[in-house]
């Protein structure tokens, strides 16, 4: 699939810079963090970068499947939950990290599990923005048509871009 005129391709270098900038914003909050929870799979890379920048050693994952056919969000399904020790105190002192908050459905499910956790994402669309505490880029309306899955890199060499709907108001 070729990129449309309004594509927002993200290189690994740009993504790394944006994730580091997100880490610096979180560092500016001057809080003690006990762990990071990465929303898989997209949150794994920014979580690793943020952990490194902030000196956090405990990393957990939560896996929620939503893009079953890689083109549109389907029914949400929790494939792997969060360990009990991080759920204590409703997630206080935990940073939840994802690469992109699209509709906010995934963040809402994790927010129910950890209402006092701090939610951070590298990129956010307007619909998902209210669920995020700290982000690098928000309000991606108007120029983000496609978001890279694997950031445009795939072992087969194929283009891997997930179509996303910009002006969804439902």
UniProtKB/Swiss-Prot annotation:
Catalytic reaction list: GMP + diphosphate = guanine + 5-phospho-alpha-D-ribose 1-diphosphate; XMP + diphosphate = xanthine + 5-phospho-alpha-D-ribose 1-diphosphate; IMP + diphosphate = hypoxanthine + 5-phospho-alpha-D-ribose 1-diphosphate
GO cellular component: plasma membrane
Residues reported in the UniProt entry to bind guanine: 102
Pfam families xrefs: Pribosyltran (PF00156)
Domain of life according to the entry: Bacteria
Pathway: Purine metabolism; GMP biosynthesis via salvage pathway; GMP from guanine: step 1/1; Purine metabolism; XMP biosynthesis via salvage pathway; XMP from xanthine: step 1/1
Binding site for 5-phospho-alpha-D-ribose 1-diphosphate: 41-42, 98-106
Cofactors required: Mg(2+)
SUPFAM superfamilies, sorted: PRTase-like
Membrane topology field: Peripheral membrane protein
Keyword Glycosyltransferase: yes
Binding-site list for xanthine: 102
Keywords: Cell inner membrane, Cell membrane, Glycosyltransferase, Magnesium, Membrane, Metal-binding, Purine salvage, Transferase
Localisation per UniProt entry: Cell inner membrane
Coiled coil: none
Documented EC number(s): 2.4.2.-, 2.4.2.22
A molecular function (GO) term: hypoxanthine phosphoribosyltransferase activity
Sequence positions that bind Mg(2+): 99
Keyword Membrane (UniProt): yes
BP-aspect Gene Ontology terms: GMP salvage; purine ribonucleoside salvage; XMP salvage
Protein family (similarity comment): Belongs to the purine/pyrimidine phosphoribosyltransferase family. XGPT subfamily.
HAMAP family associated with the record: XGPRT (MF_01903)
Purpose of the protein: Purine salvage pathway enzyme that catalyzes the transfer of the ribosyl-5-phosphate group from 5-phospho-alpha-D-ribose 1-diphosphate (PRPP) to the N9 position of the 6-oxopurines guanine and xanthine to form the corresponding ribonucleotides GMP (guanosine 5'-monophosphate) and XMP (xanthosine 5'-monophosphate), with the release of PPi. To a lesser extent, also acts on hypoxanthine.
Subunit comment: Homotetramer.
Protein name per Swiss-Prot or TrEMBL: Xanthine-guanine phosphoribosyltransferase
């Amino acid at each position: 699939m070729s990129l449309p005129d309004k594509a927002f391709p993200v290189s690994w270098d740009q993504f790394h810079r944006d994730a580091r900038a997100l880490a610096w914003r979180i560092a500016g909050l001057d809080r003690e963090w006990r762990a990071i929870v990465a929303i898989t799979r997209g949150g794994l890379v920014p979580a690793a970068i943020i952990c490194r920048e902030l000196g956090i050693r405990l990393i957990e994952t939560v896996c929620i499947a939503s893009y079953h056919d890689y083109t549109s969000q389907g029914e949400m399904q929790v494939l792997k939950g969060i360990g009990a020790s991080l759920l204590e105190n409703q997630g206080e002192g935990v940073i939840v990290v994802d690469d992109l908050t699209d509709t906010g459905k995934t963040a809402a499910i994790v927010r129910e599990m950890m209402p006092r956790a701090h939610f951070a994402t590298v990129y956010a669309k307007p619909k998902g923005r209210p669920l995020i505490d700290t982000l690098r880029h928000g309000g991606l309306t108007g120029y983000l048509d496609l978001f890279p899955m694997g950031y445009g890199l795939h072992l087969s060499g194929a283009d891997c871009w997930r179509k996303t709907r910009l002006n969804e108001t439902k």
